[in-house]
Amino acid sequence: MERSKQSHDNQADSRPTTNESSLNGHFDGLVKKTPGMWDVKGRGTAGESSSHTGSSVVENWKHERTRSIEDNEMSLPSLAAAYTTIIRGLGKDPQRQGLLKTPWRAATAMQFFTKGYQEKIIDVLNDAILDEDHDEMVIVKDIDMFSMCEHHLVPIFGRVHIGYLPNKRVLGLSKLARIVEIYSRRLQVQERLTKQIAVAITEALQPAGVGVVIEATHMCMVMRG
């Protein structure tokens, strides 16, 4: 089975450590914060002053559009109808006993697989950012990650490892896993997922540095050979 290793992160096994040797070299250069900007793997920078960037991002998070329960209920029939069309397109009878409820099951499952669109980062981080005079690297490893490839609509799964160097502020360890879950439970590519996790942590904490590593299996590669 092929595994792709890239710089990303997700939901954790709650094994924090401050021992940098356990991930020796993996975080170096992935995301390094400089005054007023963030830089992810050298692919572009963004930001103004640190304080302005942080506050503006939080405001954007507050007004982020999410998919509501009502949206799910309204879209479920059309989503189920689309699965019915797929079944017919595969040459199968959607009225056959084994397939009769499949469109609704599949539609409900897809809404669950993409439930990250229903959640806001600001709700996760609310009251979870703590003032703490701690300057050693915080590492959370083996966060379980489940996502959907946006190219083929098949699963991506693996583990995320996150490390950051605090700058007078820390985040509750369980919230790192929640950040991973929110961004992974969407239609994704691994590169974007990695960046979104790293940027969320960077903008929330303004740390001295952030590193995100994702080890993932892409079923679009494994199943197709």
Swiss-Prot record:
One of its GO terms (biological process) is tetrahydrofolate biosynthetic process. Gene3D superfamilies: 1.10.286.10, 3.30.1130.10. Residues 13-24, 47-58 have a biased composition (Polar residues). Pathway: Cofactor biosynthesis; 7,8-dihydroneopterin triphosphate biosynthesis; 7,8-dihydroneopterin triphosphate from GTP: step 1/1. Pfam families: GTP_cyclohydroI. It is found in: Cytoplasm; Nucleus. This is GTP cyclohydrolase 1. The lineage of its organism: Eukaryota, Metazoa, Chordata, Craniata, Vertebrata.
